[in-house]
Amino acid sequence: MAREKFERTKPHVNIGTIGHVDHGKTTLTAAITATLATAGGAVAKDYSDIDGAPEERARGITINTAHVEYETADRHYAHVDCPGHADYVKNMITGAAQMDGAILVVSAADGPMPQTREHILLAKQVGVPHIVVFLNKQDQVDDDELLELVELEVRELLSTYDFPGDDIPICPGSALQAIEALSSNPDVKRGDNPWVDKIFALMDAVDAYIPTPERDVEKTFLMAIEDVFSITGRGTVATGRIERGVVKVGDNVEIVGVGDTQTTTITGIEMFQKTLEEGFAGDNVGILLRGVTRENIERGMVLSKPGTITPHTNFESEVYVLTKEEGGRHTPFFTGYRPQFYVRTTDVTGSIEQFTADDGTIVEMVMPGDRIKMTAELIYPVAIEEGMRFAIREGGRTIGAGVVSKIVK
């Protein structure tokens, strides 16, 4: 049978399930696919299909992630679910699966637990902009007052981490009950079964509350420079992959990073040896720049729309330190450690100024396998922005992954 063509008729949104171990993230993922399959919007997946997630590599780190896709009446979703807690931490920090929003799964029988808190904090730090809550295992709670208490507790916790706790939709239900109802009768329609209806209600909330993200092409232009060469008689060409936005011949752009920011005009764009009038996010292009000498531009700089990105040296970040099994260090490192920070396309040396634990205490030492808040200073300014991912390297091997949470200077 010929492969089906991917029809882009509905807006696309990336989401994922987050929350404490055993609160039902994977069961909920299975329940969503089974529920939407009744309306033709998904292929039902079993728990075991999702839980046996294949390994992937992102920024040199191995992560287990399951990807499922489904559709509601309004949207197409790509949904990511991770089997293990460490996989979540790595996934969120490396941005291997970017989330436009998340479904926080909390067991109504247990209430918020340590990883509930940690995943909310991580979502805040790495820039997951919106959260919808599913209070799972409602069938195990006989007392409505208890359910209200858990809901209140979740709202307070979300507010603690600067999410709008009072406004976030919280949907109660039972993923397992919904799956059982659907496996005994796959033709259940909306309105036939209260547990299945609760999954539909959750997806209504996700449709309504998580906004359709701005597509990469709608954002301001940015391209990290991977290589530079001169074409005799024509000028200097910078090559790279356009990270976001659209760029046209005749546009003015800034060259940012390492030294003073320069402004220039684009006189030509090429892709696969063909000339283009414009390049879009995702394209690998060569951009011909007017009046720029080969000496004034190098790998690691970025081309951007004027005034949209500035070079910085000091930043706060959320970092995951690789274990030795993952190819990281065997020993801890301390404040003052000077690794390389691999930012977009280049290594920049920097020193680690401070480590801070989740509770705000200063930590002197970090062990392989830890997740920590880290303040760093680079030896020269490069184009950095909040939400940007980077790797920490030592002698060419990756020893950590991070995401910028705040620019200091």
UniProtKB/Swiss-Prot annotation:
PROSITE patterns: G_TR_1, G_TR_2. Its EC number is 3.6.5.3. Mg(2+) binds at T26. It catalyses: GTP + H2O = GDP + phosphate + H(+). Residues 10-214 form the tr-type G domain. Keywords: Chloroplast, Elongation factor, GTP-binding, Hydrolase, Magnesium, Metal-binding, Nucleotide-binding, Plastid, Protein biosynthesis. Its main location: plastid. Residues 136-139 are annotated as: G4. GO terms for cellular component: chloroplast. It is an enzyme of class 3 (hydrolase). Residues 19-26 are annotated as: G1. Residues 81-84 are annotated as: G3. GTP binds at residues 19-26, 81-85, 136-139. Coiled coil: none annotated. GO terms for biological process: translational elongation. It is found in: Plastid, Chloroplast. It holds the Pfam family GTP_EFTU_D3. GO terms for molecular function: GTP binding; GTPase activity; translation elongation factor activity. NCBIfam families: EF-Tu (TIGR00485), PRK00049.1 (NF000766), PRK12735.1 (NF009372), PRK12736.1 (NF009373), small_GTP (TIGR00231). PANTHER family: ELONGATION FACTOR TU, MITOCHONDRIAL, ELONGATION FACTOR TU-RELATED. Belongs to the TRAFAC class translation factor GTPase superfamily. Classic translation factor GTPase family. EF-Tu/EF-1A subfamily. HAMAP family: EF_Tu_B. GTP hydrolase that promotes the GTP-dependent binding of aminoacyl-tRNA to the A-site of ribosomes during protein biosynthesis. This is Elongation factor Tu, chloroplastic. It comes from Thalassiosira pseudonana (Marine diatom). The lineage of its organism: Eukaryota, Sar, Stramenopiles, Ochrophyta, Bacillariophyta.
